[in-house]
Amino acid sequence: MRVIEIETGRRLDLKVADGCFSRVAEAGTAGEVSGWVLPGLADVHNHLSLASPAGDHAEPGERVRASASLELALGVLALREPGSPDDASAALAGEPGWPRVITAGRFLAPPGGYFPGLAREVDEAGLATAAEQEAARSGGWAKIIGDFLNEQRQFTPNWSAAGLTQAIARVHERGGRVAVHALCPAAVEDAIAAVADSIEHGWAITDDHFAAMRLAGTAWVPTLTEGGSDTVCAFAASMGIPADTLEWMRCAVGAQSAIAARAHAAGVVVLAGTDAGQGPHGRIIEQVELLAAGGIPPRDAIGAASWTARRYLGLPGIQTGAPADFIRYDGDPAGDLGILRRPAEIVLGGQVRQQSANPVPLGVRH
């Protein structure tokens, strides 16, 4: 089939055999195209076993599969789970018929340093070993909770800067990567100094951090929220967070989308992550829309939830020999993001998972 690659605008001839792209070649300008394609959507911050459509009382494996099924139906063909209360998602890694799932094992936090019952709790002396263990038995990632609420309900780092740096260095020595949950200024600065591979949420990230993040290769996953600071602060207020902290949160979260756009312009890798589990699943397209609304060019905002994210995760795109993961649209979503909600075809590993009512023949071998 002849298509236009959304990332580059190239006209390509694609052939699929045995679940992979058997041919990806530049096409001439003559002839009609079957649509516009990207290598699937990707959510780099998704907790599959939390807030699952299966319900909180279902078994972990059932919760994970229900969440993954919902995401797949929307075209999420790859996702990273940066921390989980269990290991159920690891069963999907490499299993045919499911999104490409990269896990980070259990959340790592000190006693009392995260929401009750969610984290593997370790003291600072054991953090490096625990991070190494989680990365080794997961998808090569570890997730460290960098800060949380203290007794005064103020956000404060969970670890010393030295302790965090040691843990990240240990994982890096073994070839792994580390995502750090960081909200407050001190936790953000410690994560950057420790060369975290990604900062999750990053409420306190400012323009002053961009150069160091770019140099370290630290990506930012802002997990923007529909409703912005009002939504976040309403949740925080229910936890008894004092007025001065709520006001800081309101300002920080309210500025996030614009800061993310400036970070992108400065060369920081900004990626789309929904934080599904904290809220409902199935919101990756909303995340693209929020990134674009903040000022990231629409094509780049799509990339943050597709080709840019896949490259960051070490997954191939549309190339000869790669798994045939792609979505075809009848128009270019960079010109109208609403097109992302109307896929003509979702293909995973060469298998058509979803079609529009009148699909264009793609020549995919089932």
PLM feature segments, named:
Residues 1-30, 37, 327, 331-336, ...:
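N-terminal metal-binding scaffold of metallo-dependent hydrolase/deaminase domains
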Residues 3, 302-308, 320-366:
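C-terminal cap of metal-dependent C-N hydrolases
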Residues 19, 34, 42-45, 75, ...:
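Divalent metal-coordination and catalytic microenvironments
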Residues 44, 51, 60-176, 216-229:
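Divalent-metal coordination cores built from histidine and acidic residues
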Residues 154-257, 265-266, 271, 276-278, ...:
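Active-site core of metal-dependent hydrolases
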Residues 173, 253-332:
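His/Asp/Glu-enriched, well-ordered alpha-helical/loop segment
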